[in-house]
Amino acid sequence: KERTESIDTRIYDPQDGKYKVKNCKVNFMVYQNNELINNDEYQYLHLMNSIMNYGLPVEGRNGKVMSSFGEKMVFNLDRFPLLTTKRMGYKTILRELLWFIKGSTDNQELVDKGVHIWSGNASKEFLESRGLDYEEGDLGPIYGFQWRHFGANYHGKHGSYVDCGYDQLKWLIQEIKENPSSRRLILSAWNPAFLDLMALPPCHILSQFYVNQAEGTLSCQLYQRSGDMFL
């Protein structure tokens, strides 16, 4: 449950050496019943704490970061599949996923739906910094393109790719139906030959699926090479 309250905060004014009281609105996230807490979430919170306290300081592409390697989290998707201790843009997540599944590389399609998470990487300035002479909004052969047209030559966001490349997603769905015990149920967005053509190389690069026929369940293991854990 979320509530908003007005509280008085004392702010020090260095010019006159006095404290001033300022009324501020603060959002609180409140649990009414501890039994309702998403237990799977504790592993996420524990990992955040571990990175902050024991992570390795690294100077990366985006400046200084705290780094950790080989961490693992397991979530039961039969229960509530989202974090509850921070705001989660469910519609944004869903729209981006559907955009990936479509195989699109055109950021404008996301913008038209109110999704701007790729806009910073789709600007002409950013694309030029990557050495890419694309039209603004063209993200190159990123996730969805690799899922639906793996290996196809890239001709820009307006290109026609019908029957071009290998449709991994189509194959994966068919293979799960016809050969559920296969150990090759893999979906990959990592194509080394195309990394320099992408606005950004993929972060979640590989997913492997596992069918438990006895229980009638489908599990997914995802490998993510890099992630902004606190966003």
Regions inferred by a protein language model and the residue ranges of each:
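Terminal, non-catalytic protein-protein interaction segments that mediate quaternary/complex assembly
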Residues: 17-231
